[in-house]
A protein has these predicted regions:
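Mobile, glycine- and charge-enriched loop segments
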Residues: 1-2
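Intrinsic-disorder/low-complexity accessory segments
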Residues: 7, 11, 15-16, 29, ...
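Histidine-centered divalent metal-coordination motifs
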Residues: 22-26
Length: 554
């Protein structure tokens, strides 16, 4: 999603280097880090890539030993999650490495470390320069093997898939077409090719991503088919890896990331070859008999793009309603959450509405706009019924500040600004917010300290209709507090089970060797897991979804 990263990946793919170093800075008290990396390493990383990291590390060590500079290797920084400047190049056949120098923006021109040493900008530059020269020297020394192994890596991409599956199938039926298009855009940026199967295929053996169990599936024309035998087979196999194998439980980042989970798409890993039926292109049958002056426009709210359209309509001042009950109109069945824009109450905005929805109907995959010439439904409530609720454009505030996670804040802000294109107010800290000016307040993950007065004001505001969205750690401020209905524990039976588990852990912790302290401390951490969440899709928060959803917990 980041435009800077998109530019970097595009530039990288033009050059396809044999060696790639991602230069970073870490805390001021840490010595220099260079490869070889720590475990875990993803199984796609080859023996040569591992060995070459050792070769280059040896050259770097010699350069530092001569100067008496401190360094460490094989700790902290692993090669598992494919989003970094060392792993991503690795999965493109290069020797990818992270180099970390103590410093960061805090260090400035010089800073005193905890042991009383003065760390200067000049010394930090000297260290990075030393590893740069040593790395180039190592690459030159091993150039013949580098070229040979790089060529073999990419030859294997087209001849022998790196992942566990011959192909990946994203069925058109039951998937959000808009998200399928988002996925293909991601694949395009990685140079990964895809097609659609030939029609009338027989069922083939596969892995169902939703259960991680073997099954059979019948590929159909219109489905998205990604063959593993292609120039970027390795990165494809990693990005679609449903259950990555960990060689070490201590890892720098998340342990689950498969794109079908990230995009909320049904997916099957095929264990046999499936013939392509040509280029994949999502198409939807548009209404050829367009009603020029409709009674109402109906927007099928089953894709995230529907929220973007709703945002555009609200910014224009259009009056939009949402259905709380399924209905049938114009020969089409519509679910809860469907948006309805009637001519009545929008008389002065008809041209703007038509322009917005005409463009959306053409350009947005998975978004269906239906024009009807009557408010009389064939089944379910009529369009003038109280089952269609007016949607007020909310005034939204997003909390920022020192104690708010910049990553969580950025995620929320990006969603509103780049995806929904909806205006929000950024407020620095909960102390400065005037709740009367907002309908919705979003608290990203963070460490909030709310006093009794603030809690009372928030409670009154929520009671009067304000909507408070607390994410992750922000929920701690309201857990086990009277009137908020949020508990850290479950029912009595759940709590007893939790206490039994805690007692068992306490006993094992009590007698564990001190050397295992770090591992014991992360025993209950889940840095990457996929949860199947049951949804009540009669509730407005779940409109547009099915009865369950796969979500990645990071």
């Amino acid at each position: 999603t980041q435009i800077e990263t998109q530019a970097r990946t595009s530039f990288y793919r033009k050059w396809m280097p044999h060696v790639h170093v991602d230069y970073h800075e870490q805390g001021i008290n840490s010595p220099y880090y260079f490869a070889p990396a720590a475990e875990p390493l993803h199984k796609v990383i080859t023996p040569w890539q591992r060995k070459c990291q050792e070769h280059i590390g040896g050259f770097n060590a010699t350069a530092f030993d001569i100067r008496g500079a401190l360094y460490f290797t094989r700790e902290i920084f692993d090669l598992f999650y494919p989003s970094y400047g060392d792993t991503w190049p690795m999965f493109h056949g290069a020797i990818g490495m992270t180099y970390e120098q103590g410093g960061s923006s805090r260090a400035g021109r010089s800073i005193l470390t905890e042991i009383g040493d003065t760390l200067t900008l000049a010394y930090r530059i000297e260290n990075h320069h030393a590893t740069a020269i040593a790395t180039i020297s190592a690459a030159v020394h091993h150039k013949d093997q580098l070229l040979k192994e790089f060529s073999a890596y990419h030859r294997r991409n087209s001849e022998e898939p790196w992942g566990d599956y011959s192909a990946y199938l994203i069925p058109a039926e039951g998937n959000d077409e808009g998200k399928m298009v988002w996925l293909t855009e991601m694949l395009d940026k990685h140079g990964i090719t895809y097609t659609t199967p030939r029609s009338a295929h027989k069922s083939v053996p596969a892995l169902d991503y939703s259960t991680l169990l073997p099954t059979t599936v019948k590929p159909l024309k219109g489905d998205l088919l990604i063959d593993s035998r292609q120039p970027h087979s390795a990165i494809l196999g990693v990005l679609f890896d449903p259950d990555p194998v960990l060689s070490d439980s201590l890892t720098y980042d998340i342990t689950t990331w498969a794109l079908p989970f990230a995009y909320g798409l049904k997916c099957y890993g095929l264990t046999s070859t499936t013939k392509s039926g040509g280029k994949f292109a999502y198409t939807i049958e548009k209404d050829e008999k367009k009603i020029e002056s409709p009674y109402a426009w109906i927007v099928d709210y089953k894709t995230d793009e529907g929220t973007t359209i709703l945002s555009q309509l609200m910014k224009t001042g259009d009056l939009v309603r949402v259905a709380d009950t399924p209905f049938k109109s114009g020969g089409i069945e519509f679910d809860r959450g469907t948006l309805v824009i009637t001519k009545r109450n929008n008389e002065t905005l008809l041209d703007e509405i038509d322009e917005i929805l005409d463009l959306a109907d053409i350009e947005i995959a998975g978004l269906r706009v239906t024009r009807v010439n009557s408010g009389l439904s064939e089944s379910g409530p009529d369009l003038g019924s109280e089952h269609f609720h007016f949607l007020k454009a909310p005034r939204v505030a997003v909390i920022s500040g020192e104690n708010v996670s910049s990553l969580s804040f950025g995620e929320v802000w990006h969603k509103f600004e780049q995806i929904y294109e909806y205006p929000v107010s950024v407020v620095k800290g909960m102390k400065r917010i005037d709740l009367d000016n907002y309908d919705v307040v979003v608290m990203p993950r963070g460490w909030y300290s709310l006093n009794e007065t603030q809690m009372s004001e928030l409670s009154s505001w929520v009671s009067e209709g304000g909507q408070l969205i607390a994410i992750g750690g922000a929920c701690r401020s309201f857990a086990d507090k009277e009137g908020w209905g949020l508990s850290r524990t479950g029912d009595e039976e759940d709590e007893m089970l939790r206490e039994d588990e805690y007692d068992a852990h306490s006993k094992s912790d009590r007698f564990a060797p001190f050397a295992l302290d770090t591992r014991m401390s992360v025993m209950d951490d889940i840095p990457g897991a996929v949860y199947k969440i049951g949804l009540d899709n009669t509730h407005p928060l779940a409109y547009g979804y099915g009865d369950s959803y796969l979500s990645i917990k990071t």
